[in-house]
Amino acid sequence: MFTEYTGNRQFDLQLNRTFATILDRAGMETIAATTLPRLRTTSQITKLAQGLAERFSSEGDEDAAWRLHELAAFYLGADDPRKRRFIDAMSASFDEAHRSLALTRHAVPFGDGELTAMRWEADPTDRAQAPAGTPTTLIMMNGFDGYAEEIIDFASHFPTRPFDTIAFDGPGQGHTVLAGMPLEPPWERPTNAVLDYFGIESAAALGVSFGGYLVTRAAAYCPRISHVIAFDMMYRLLDGLTAPLPRPLRPIADAVVGNPRPAWLIDAALGTASRLSADLGWKLQQASHLTGLSRPSEVLRAFGDYTMEPLEGRITQPCLVFAGDADQYVPFERLGDVRRALENSASLDVRAFRHAQDPDMAQHCQIGDLDRAFAIMGDWLQAAPMKSLRNSIRG
């Protein structure tokens, strides 16, 4: 269930993302009812998450601790020494919490560095019972602000796991960007590096958040991807900056972000705006971290490369696309553009959710009901190989 704790959509998304799975712990209902609604600043969130992470770790509850360590790091800039300390603690707690599982860490050679990857072996019983044609490997792609640990943990929401699951931090993501490797547009390159490292000839691919765009880019140029899941859709990365604006203002904002000149004026305007909006301030901070660029005008130009427009007609795999009209990062009206970009897909299954009828599933990445979202994905992955109708559209 998605809970509006503070009334700040950005804060509420991150709080639901972290707290949804730990509300059953002692004292957490009280914190959710009395403490979370009073949060007003990113520093308050950091302080609360750090304190709770340390508490749960001292109690031996590492499954709760790693989630809270990640939240403690979330709003910190890359130059804050606490960020790396919290992320290291997150990784240590995650490994301790999952040491009984068939889950391993890997360093995938890429360029002059390495990509962080994690592999979770399929459940043998689930694999034996899966329909013929079910993918044997699922690649999970990170997004704008996650880490490989969180991405692979999403797989625990599948009702069954008949496939090996591999999550990775590509350039500009998670552990990889902390090591100094910035974001790059040709996402087929890190995807191919991961497939080569594990010796995989065919795999389904699932992109989370910004990964909903990245997975389509990879699929357009990587024929080893057999199935595509956009969880949820993302037609254009720049929409994340303009989506929160009132609809009449979006064309003006689009013109500015599409052509950020004069640079000095854009830099000054966004610098002022980011001080007035915690959401925009965080987005620009994170965007600078991902790209390695310091000026907002440079970031906007770089983000212009991340759009599905040039991919139109190139993606031929079966595709499953999620969309919600309460998504704070992706305008719902982009669904038509996404359909057009995927018009040559072997099949197109769109699951569109509206807040009035389905508020939990209408949020970004269906964060209000992950079990249901992953049940849909699991069913689709096991049924998609048997589809014969080209461009069958649902939703």
Residues covered by each model-derived region:
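The serine-hydrolase catalytic nucleophile loop
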Residues: 144-156
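Alpha/beta-hydrolase active-site loop
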Residues: 150, 180-200
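Short alpha-helix in the alpha/beta-hydrolase fold that links the catalytic acid
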Residues: 154, 317, 331-341
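Conserved alpha/beta-hydrolase
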Residues: 158-175
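Short beta-strand/loop motif that positions the catalytic acidic residue
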Residues: 315, 321-323, 327
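Catalytic histidine neighborhood in serine/cysteine hydrolases
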Residues: 340-361
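Catalytic active-site module of serine/aspartate enzymes centered on a nucleophile-bearing elbow/loop
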Residues: 356-359, 363-395
